[in-house]
């Protein structure tokens, strides 16, 4: 069967809907898909796009839905619960796969399908959004400046905007789990916010703390640098509170606590408004050093995380549909280079 279509699974989520809305700007006509027929059909009718309704639970049914699909954009998280089924179906049907995951464990899991994906002649690219395009490109940019770098620090500092239901749900599902760093090539569990760092942006010292961001996995694949930490902007008062989170991890992992938090999430707006996104921006900072003590730094500015995710997914989709891809497991920068981020609107490298 000739495969020419793009399928966007999880189109009714906040980020999925953004991708669907912007698709026309990239000359892409996705098939919208998901489990909720009421929401998917309403969105499809509003955007005048085709749609399909199916779940990920039945492997045979899922593969049947992908028979005529060339590429899946997977936007239905949490990906720890949904990624495996879709990846395996894509490999079985020779369908390319990208997603908007940012979970370290999911990157590591999908990486194990590299050989199977190559044999099926398909590309697997988790993290084709804000997690991790800007930071992945910054990591490779620094690696090229200092090829023998042994340590990498990355930081992102959002200004304005707010998080979506989906992102908040993923965060809630990981409450009490702590953080992660990469040391000597190995993933090492750490307390959340085990380190703080003052990042110099245009002469201003901005406070950041460590978080378990996807680059702990992906930047290692992209650069081979064996020691990696990722930081995000945080108020010092919040950081001091989080330093003691380990005392409460046992209760944060309880289902009744997570259910209560999920109810609070569901009562909030789905995500930032178009106006909030238009004025929000993100600064990405990176630093590498080697055994000789030589140091290189880089600063990048880009739009808010949700806009970068939608534009980034569609840019990569456009490239894949033109045959511009590498088979097997890939990261955005390992496939498309350090300047991929500069092809996304409102992005510029400051240094």
Q: Where do the PLM segments sit?
A:
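Active-site-lining helix/loop region of Rossmann-like oxidoreductase modules
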Residues: 9, 14, 144-284, 289-290, ...
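C-terminal helical cap and adjacent loop that interface with cofactors, partners, or active-site loops
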Residues: 271-351
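N-terminal Rossmann NAD(P)H-binding glycine-rich loop of SDR-like oxidoreductase domains
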Residues: 6-26
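N-terminal Rossmann-fold cofactor-binding loop
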Residues: 33-37, 55-56
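Conserved Rossmann-fold cofactor-binding substructure of NAD(P)-dependent oxidoreductases
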Residues: 53-69, 75-81
